[in-house]
Amino acid sequence: MRGLPELIACEFLKLKRRKILPAVVALALLFPLLVVFVTRSGMNGDGSLSYLQGRFDYSYTLMLSYGLVLLEPCLLGVLASLLFFQERDNDTFKNIRAIPVAATKLVVTKLLVLLIYSLIYTLANVCFTVIFTWIFDAGTVYGLVFKFGFACMFSVGITIATLPAVVFIVYFNKTYLISMLLSFFYSVLSWAALVVVSMN
């Protein structure tokens, strides 16, 4: 679509005022730290390569299971409420109509921004998991190309799976608190469903 990169840049500039990117990176920093700490505390002193690689796999799996499956939908729900409500809150719909920007293009732009933030959060999670594994000697890091690629594909899947929650948020068009609660409950239900499926 013509003009889409400019619209995406505008959405990022609007979110920049709310300090969203530092918050996303901070969240992606804290969770891998906790994950690697749990992995390190469970190590038994085995120095074999297979065991150390297994500990890194354990940290990576925990990061995917909790950092992405549980936390990322909450993050995307909050971002969706900010992206879709800011025109309402700032009373800038009349400015958009004056440009004009097609509603479809505006929605696609906001969804692409959600996807970009999702990938930023995911890549930061993997990076910090790798860094903390090195720092705390909590395993042997390996297979990074595959792990980064798989995490990105996983993140895209989570973003797509979160779209029903985004639709609810936009449709009800209520307060930020209600949007966050909807995102939280949707995230918990999705995570619980994944746990049940993995156990069967």
Sequence positions of predicted segments:
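Helix-loop-helix units of permease transmembrane domains in multi-pass membrane transporters
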Residues: 81-115
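Aromatic- and glycine-rich beta-strand/loop motifs that create alpha-glucan
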Residues: 1-28, 174
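Transmembrane helix segments
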Residues: 34-41, 172-200
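Hydrophobic alpha-helical elements at and bordering transmembrane segments
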Residues: 8-15, 106-107, 148, 152
